[in-house]
């Protein structure tokens, strides 16, 4: 009898599993995903309009690092001065604070002891994106069908340093009860979910500099597979502090040659590049199932039609010289979209201004797009010359730049390409001025330490 019941139970379980697989396949095949809202906080300013205008105009959000920027408030002056002196890189891309238009108002967004900067940036960007999408649901069912997928690269290192100092000073009882929830990367998603009552998937990718792209791509699949109808997705970061800058400096990842001329330090694809400029900020988009967006008359910026991922399986920080991981990510995004390489109008390159990484990505773009790239037909650029490298937020912010390129018909420029890398020639060359053009399709690349790669492909609709 027991055996018979077990067989019936297993048979029923298999039937339910088969139905689930069938349903999931159906969702993946038929549920299209579109972008209906945008929000950002960047070194170029708070808000999409301010950031985009300054980007297209060729402005730069990078400045020199100061002693106060190290976030060492509990340390004595001698230690602060010693630490600052030891840092080989003294440039960074900061979010502009203030109460004026285009500035980040900490009184509005950092008004709780439980909120670290990276969380505040994400909530601010999400608020702009949701208002842009006109999606602030009040019905319980709509909230249950709305999720959040906002990742981060590091969390709040400065809060960890301050907490460790309490141990050194034998003052552990002064440790804030908010310490743990303040530093956890997933708390950016958590705070957005709580603020708006969203009860769909609550997710946070942590994949170094590919985080923002993975968070958006994962959110797209959640909609495709029916887990949600709307997802608030993106990345956030605030890691300009003594320990983070020291750590990246020790790994020889940061620019050190342009401390006296900060706005020239981030120079993707240029021969004089010597490392990236650390930045901060957040980019968040509202993703929505296409029919759901149409029914409510939502403004649609673009469709997210391709998401490709890969692993280098090569080195902890450097890509392989042949760029195979980047090639696989771009190729897989193209395959999912059903588009051919010569149908892509613009590529927002990951290029961070590192000697190896930029050349490898340029080589990968030539491999994937072939004559379409080498003939000069394909437009491509790296926007990190203007923003610096926003680490976990980079993929999301640059996805927004790609979407805006489609929306406004302008491909943004690459700053500081004065002496192009030898891999380029007269036709195969990154944009050095913003270009008005018809952009029907745009790809955004994001690659991270550990050999993690992601490419997002957007198309007009």
Curated annotation (Swiss-Prot):
Disulfide bonds: none annotated. The keyword Lipid metabolism applies. Inhibited by cerulenin. GO terms for molecular function: 3-oxoacyl-[acyl-carrier-protein] synthase activity. It catalyses: a fatty acyl-[ACP] + malonyl-[ACP] + H(+) = a 3-oxoacyl-[ACP] + holo-[ACP] + CO2; butanoyl-[ACP] + malonyl-[ACP] + H(+) = 3-oxohexanoyl-[ACP] + holo-[ACP] + CO2; hexanoyl-[ACP] + malonyl-[ACP] + H(+) = 3-oxooctanoyl-[ACP] + holo-[ACP] + CO2; octanoyl-[ACP] + malonyl-[ACP] + H(+) = 3-oxodecanoyl-[ACP] + holo-[ACP] + CO2. Residues 30-460 form the Ketosynthase family 3 (KS3) domain. It is found in: Mitochondrion. Pathway: Lipid metabolism; fatty acid biosynthesis. One of its GO terms (biological process) is fatty acid biosynthetic process. InterPro entries: 3-oxoacyl-ACP_synth-2, Beta-ketoacyl_synthase, Ketoacyl_synth_AS, Ketoacyl_synth_C, Ketoacyl_synth_N, PKS_Beta-ketoAc_synthase_dom, Thiolase-like. This is 3-oxoacyl-[acyl-carrier-protein] synthase, mitochondrial. It comes from Arabidopsis thaliana.
